[in-house]
């Protein structure tokens, strides 16, 4: 099994826009090697009789019925804003025509 080289760590660090010193390079090389060893162990597991899944547990959505409600607090809400025009908030223009 090949070990992670310093050059490989530097390449990954460069892609991630990280600047690593020599100690950090050695540390990351060791950590990446441990991760790859773990993956190699997982690859040896026989999963032929295990059904494919997308999640470890079943996820169920709980829906509620939408209900329309009339709101009488529009004026109160508009008063909270810094600026308004009629029944709308007034905001600074950000798009030039």
Swiss-Prot record:
Single GO MF descriptor: ATP binding
EC number: 6.3.5.-
The entry's keywords: ATP-binding, Ligase, Nucleotide-binding, Protein biosynthesis
Gene3D superfamilies assigned: Glu-tRNAGln amidotransferase C subunit, N-terminal domain
InterPro entries associated with the record: Asp/Glu-ADT_sf_sub_c, GatC
Secretion signal, residue range per the UniProt entry: none
One Pfam family in the UniProt entry: GatC
Keyword Plastid: no
Top class in the EC scheme: ligase
Family indicated by similarity: Belongs to the GatC family.
Record's function text: Allows the formation of correctly charged Asn-tRNA(Asn) or Gln-tRNA(Gln) through the transamidation of misacylated Asp-tRNA(Asn) or Glu-tRNA(Gln) in organisms which lack either or both of asparaginyl-tRNA or glutaminyl-tRNA synthetases. The reaction takes place in the presence of glutamine and ATP through an activated phospho-Asp-tRNA(Asn) or phospho-Glu-tRNA(Gln).
Protein name: Aspartyl/glutamyl-tRNA(Asn/Gln) amidotransferase subunit C
Source species of the chain: Prochlorococcus marinus (strain MIT 9301)
Name of the gene: gatC
């Amino acid at each position: 099994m090949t070990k992670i080289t310093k050059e490989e760590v530097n390449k990954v660090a460069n892609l991630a826009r990280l600047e690593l010193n020599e100690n950090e390079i050695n540390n990351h090389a060791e950590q990446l090697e441990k991760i790859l060893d773990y993956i190699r162990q997982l690859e040896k597991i026989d999963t032929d009789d295990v059904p494919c899944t997308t999640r470890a547990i079943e996820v169920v959505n709980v829906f509620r019925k939408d209900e329309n409600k009339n709101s009488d607090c529009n004026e109160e809400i508009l008063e909270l804003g810094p600026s308004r025009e009629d029944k709308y908030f007034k905001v600074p223009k950000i798009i030039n025509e």
